[in-house]
Amino acid sequence: MLPPESAMLEQYRVGRASLREALRLIEAQGLITLKPGPGGGPVVGDIHAANLGRTASLYFRFSGATYRQLIEAMVTMDPWLAELAALRADRDMANELVALCIAETKAVRGDSEGAVRFAPGFHQAVYELSGNPVLSTMTAAIDAVFIEQILRTVDLSSHQGQFLDDHQAIAQAIANADAELAKTLATAHMQNVAACCYEQAGAQLDRRIEWR
Amino acid sequence: MIPEGTSDTASARGAMKPSDPRRVIKTSDTVALQIVRDIKARGLVKGDRLPSETSMLQEYGVSRGSLREAFRLLEVQGFIRFKPGPGGGPIVGSVEPENLARTSTLYFHLGGMTYGDLFSTQELFEPLCARLACANPDRHERMASFLHGDALLGSADRADAARFHDEVHQLAGNRVLALYTAAVTHLISTDIMATMDLAELSASMLEEHRQLAQVIADGEAAEAERLMSQHFKAQHGYCRQRWPSRLNELIEWR
């Protein structure tokens, strides 16, 4: 919980309107929540890359970027993080990722939505192992736009077996500190995901990115 | 007309991510979205006038407070501006990577991220842009003015250096990667490079830009990637040596 409005007014010595606008601008990025009602007020929120993705997609839209370009960016950036994860990752954490992958694979095998549901968690775990939070945040922001906008029209469920195997192999390469292999496997995996999107959505992906 | 309190979060996104982190969509967000769509639908470009506040109030059927908040959300990102004085009002702004950079730093700062993280990110993005630029058919034309860098002008004018990198970002073709790279490079140049004395580096920087312009114009992708990587690693190395503590400093939100 942040200090109440009255305290902030005194502390920052600004007008009520300016303070409210400032809070609203930070709220627009999802970094604080304004709790309404008595006992309410500004509360510190979590940092979600999806919110940055939403703002970034407005820039992408205005600069004329297409969904195909977004996918290409994702195909490039995700493997960078897999490589960094293999180079820097804490071995115990990397082994946990492998164990998690194996468990998740067993749990979702045969559940047609399972792989898609698990995918963001896997990629996020790799990003956290990378040791570069700036690149992770920027990549996760793009991933969020991909999930919110492209995965609405593309159905990846028939490829789930392949994707789960890919994840497991990438996790294993990271755990073995084999950076080159991790990057190669992550690239192949992302190209595979991209190919599925191109195959299903085709020319639709040449449209400009929407802001929603 | 947009009903007050419209929310598209529940229905549209639930299936993908069970725990939806995105904040609740407010009326002002929906109005902002509508303004952005109308800019496109009406074919408005930078500097064009938007409808007056009064006519937008009527068109969107929302309160003045919500409309003004929507304006402010877009104004902060530079997408609309306000022309002051009589006959003034909202006009279409432009897409500037520095505004995206500024918003990003809010996340970077709160996430406890450092300039060192930003350096490592730049070392990946910039060489990639150089490689991609080599496939652009306009590369000769756009690199032409950098081919004959006059070493006597020495002190490698910062604006000129920025212009060189801007051109490379744009030549990269992929606008998502170009925006991201420009945002990262902008942050490093304003927060770090602008505070450093680059005198010792400037002569070699100018020569490096000239060499890079040449290999990009010639379309030598692998060489362009290698040189660009070297170019930034040299700058980062210089900074690391002179001001090692700066790398561990939190990225500032300005």
Where are these regions (language model features)?
Chain A
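Short loop-to-helix capping motifs
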Residues: 4-5, 131-133, 177-178
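Flexible interhelical turns and helix-capping residues at alpha-helix boundaries
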Residues: 12, 63, 108, 153, ...
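An N-terminal domain-start capping segment
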Residues: 24, 28, 43-49, 110-118, ...
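Hydrophobic aliphatic residue packing
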Residues: 14, 32, 44, 126, ...
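Structural signature of alpha-solenoid helical repeat scaffolds
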Residues: 155-158
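Conserved amphipathic alpha-helical segments that form helical-bundle/coiled-coil interaction surfaces
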Residues: 70-152, 163-169, 181-196
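Short linear motifs at protein or domain termini
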Residues: 1-76, 83, 87, 203-212
